[in-house]
Amino acid sequence: MRVPSRRPRRSSRRGSLALLLLLTLTLGACASAPPAPPLPPNVEAERLRLEDAWQSFGDLRSLAEIAIRQRGRSQRFNGALLLKRPASLRFEALSPFGPPLLVVAARPEQVTIWEVPAGRAYLLPSTPDANRRWLGLALPTEDLVALLAGHVRPLRAPRSGTLLPADEVGPSVRLSGDEGTQRTWLDPAGRPLKVEWTEGKNPMRVTFTRPASDPATGGSVPRAIALVTLDGRLEVSVTYRDPAVDTGFDPALVTLDVPQGVEIQDFR
């Protein structure tokens, strides 16, 4: 008596396994997070207004006084600041006499920090993690440039949003998503007065002090900016003098070529 061949059963088993795998993948895809619902129209309008204001910014040049207090250590610099959208900046901290004390230049692909008296320079990638090393905040360079220009980049891919009634600062828009929660207070012209991030990588608050009127900038540039992390470990204040916006300066001005003879530490 012949024993029936088991090959058809194996084929059937393989087919069942394939079907089970396909079903598992299909169910897994169905179980993924659904797309976020659209924001309420009034919230989306405010989000777009913030984004459009940032996109309309070109450049800024100004004398600046920058004070930094981090974990009990204080530093103060006076110098010249250049900003160019989307992610370029240059700051030269000037000494009363002689060469600059410090030069920081950031581009979309690289950050260069040159400690002039020490004859040392550091090259870092222009990433949030690298910016944490010198700035103390894991901010994208584009977000840093936006804040220094008096703008706020609205939270990317928000999953919910709310317009909040005015408090002692003004009305505000709150956006929440995977990056945390961002709340931005606005003046009657829709310009940010204060922004606060919570529940993300950089819980902090930034306050903009805007002039009542400024014919040179149309009030788009704040007179002063104060940044503080919510844990109090970092405080930064920036005060501008004679700012000028959208002058169309040469982009080469924000680049920094470290001269020969300077010790370079490359962390890229």
Regions found by a protein language model. Give the residues of each.
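Sec-dependent bacterial lipoprotein signal peptides
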Residues: 1-30
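An acidic-aromatic
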Residues: 87-143
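Scaffold/interface architecture of coatomer-like assemblies
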Residues: 149-151
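N-terminal leader/targeting segments and the immediate start of mature chains
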Residues: 30-76, 266-268
